[in-house]
Structure formats: C-alpha cells, structure tokens
Amino acid sequence: MQKDFIIDEWQIYQAKAYGADCILLISEILSDREIKQFIGIAASLDMDVLLEFHQVTELSKILNSNLNIIGINNRNLSTLETTPFHALEIRDMFINEFIDHDIVAESGISSTLIIDKYLSNGITKFLIGESLLRESF
C-alpha cells in the first residue's frame, strides 16, 4: 500500500509503478471531486483504495465515496494528538452508516490490549506503522 499524502494523480501512477496494489486517500486534504477522480484512477489501474478520515465533518465524503473499506484515523492530523479508541467511538456513533463497510482502525495501535478491545468490538483490521518501527524485537 502506498501510504502517503496523495494530492496529485501522478502519485497514484507512481505507486502502481513501484508495485503498490492499494493507495491511502486522506479525506481531510482532498475535495469530493479529487476523491472521486483518484478512486477512478486507482480502479483503472486495478488498485484498491483505503479512504481515511478522523473528523466527523468528513463523514459525507466517506459515505459518498461508495467504497467498502474505510479507515478511521485515531490521530488528528491537525494537532497530531492520538486517541487510541477514537475509531471505535466514531464507528459506534454512526453504526448504521457503517453497517456495509469494513472499518480499519488506524494509528495509535501500540499494544495487544488495544487490539483486543477492537477485536472484541468487531473491528478486525488495523493500519499499524509507528509502533512497529519503535518496537525492539
């Protein structure tokens, strides 16, 4: 997956050229038009799209995207503050809207206790990066 701040279509072509089969789109930095355009480009390249959001104000963009896989970022990109169960709280607030979606909890997943809480509440997909990089094996 190309996990980047994608703001231009050339980045999608570049991701495909480098072997990515999925791209991450961040709703807070893209317009509805850009989201639709980038989803279309990804589909034409046989790539999946993970569309993420943090703020509830972005919900209409998410639901209008017609994607089945939705990421809820536990990190507020404006403040960089991380709330480990934000994704669970948002999913629960809008459970009916997300009934047909696979939810990916993103960021702030730093322990098996956090993962266990998500699993026991039906969220089984995670995007984990920083905590793996900081872990010593």
Predicted features and spans:
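Catalytic beta/alpha-barrel core
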Residues: M1-D8, D21-D32, D46-T57, I70-E81, ...
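Catalytic cores of alpha/beta
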Residues: I7-G19, H54-N66, N96, D100-I128
